[in-house]
Amino acid sequence: MSQNRRLFTSESVTEGHPDKICDQISDSILDEILKKDPNARVACETSVTTGLVLVSGEITTSTYVDIPKTVRDTIKEIGYTRAKYGFDAETCAVLTSIDEQSADIAQGVDKALEAREGTMTEEELDAIGAGDQGLMFGFANNETEELMPLPISLAHKLSLRLTEVRKDQTLAYLRPDGKTQVTVEYDDQNKPVRIDTVVISTQHAPEVTLEQIQSDLKEHVISPVVPSELIDEQTKYFINPTGRFVIGGPQGDAGLTGRKIIVDTYGGYARHGGGAFSGKDATKVDRSAAYAARYVAKNIVAAGLADSCEVQLAYAIGVAQPVSISIDTFGTGKASEEKLIEVVRANFDLRPAGIIKMLDLRRPIYKQTAAYGHFGRHDLDLPWEKTDKADTLRQEALGQ
């Protein structure tokens, strides 16, 4: 590797990873509630370990959801359907401990500070306040068609492919738990030029040999996903490098909702505000504002206003307007960052109520995001992935 080149690595996990099981359970419960009560307040946390699922949190809703059934259906769909996998949807215990949202938090969310103090316009009076303080980041760059960094894009595609060949029985000996990792080499212009390393660890049946797993994964998982022009004779492969991965899922490691926030976002390529997504309704800005920030960043890059763009939003609990908006184009901007913030403020309503309306977030669309990333998903129709504002932004920022 020449002196001016650098390596960057991102990882992904499959839907059978213990932490991802929890994310999917939390978002399945959220979706079931939103189907019947779009205005519900949900903060649902899940923990899994050998033979046990614990669902806890704060839920305020007018509807009833059969939580144990939702939990079991989700685990079954992931593929933990036999006791020999160490976790079984039919026989695992499901415990629930659910409270209502705190009245102190609710008063700030139900009516924003601006409404309580009379500083909002009539049009704004119904706006909700942010459900918490915090900072959220959104990012986009032009490394891939979906405007995501290449390392996380490839890591997710490998994880998704790993699940596909398990579920369609191409590799019937695979089991649900798995992880992927991709290291990309960048040149001195910060352009990806080759794949340096691919790591895949997958749970498997005990009778299969390591040699067969390595051969099959190269043929059926890596080859269909990783662009051949980025692979050379120096590319390294580590496939099940421990030699054996039979004990996996919640039997191998306990899992928790919100433990895979870098996998969920940009693979470490952009900054992260620290808040997790799954199990939270859209009044929680941890989720909705991170989606809005991605929407803004993606439209800026799609408009040709920058090759790379990171957007930061920040909120105070119970206050509707963001306390700050920051944009960094890393020296690639075609307009000043001040100008970009100006056109963003003019074209995106970044109050919580505005985000919910702009992205139509009171729908049951969340479970599908709970594995393989919330961003850059061409296989899903996600509102924050649209580039419908790109033309307007270009016109207003550059006058063309």
Swiss-Prot record:
Q: What is its main location?
A: cytoplasm
Q: Where is this region: Flexible loop?
A: 101-111
Compartments in which it is found: Cytoplasm
Supply the InterPro entries for this chain. ADOMET_SYNTHASE_CS, S-AdoMet_synt_C, S-AdoMet_synt_central, S-AdoMet_synt_N, S-AdoMet_synthetase, S-AdoMet_synthetase_sfam
Quick one: which gene encodes this?
A: metK
The protein's name = S-adenosylmethionine synthase
Gene Ontology annotations for the cellular component aspect, listed alphabetically: cytoplasm
NCBIfam families according to UniProt? metK
Task: Give the species this sequence originates from.
Answer: Bacillus pumilus (strain SAFR-032)
Enzyme Commission designation: 2.5.1.6
Binding-site residues, L-methionine: 58, 101, 253, 284
Record-level GO BP terms: one-carbon metabolic process; S-adenosylmethionine biosynthetic process
Tell me how this protein assembles.
Homotetramer; dimer of dimers.
Q: What Pfam families is this protein classified in?
A: S-AdoMet_synt_C, S-AdoMet_synt_M, S-AdoMet_synt_N
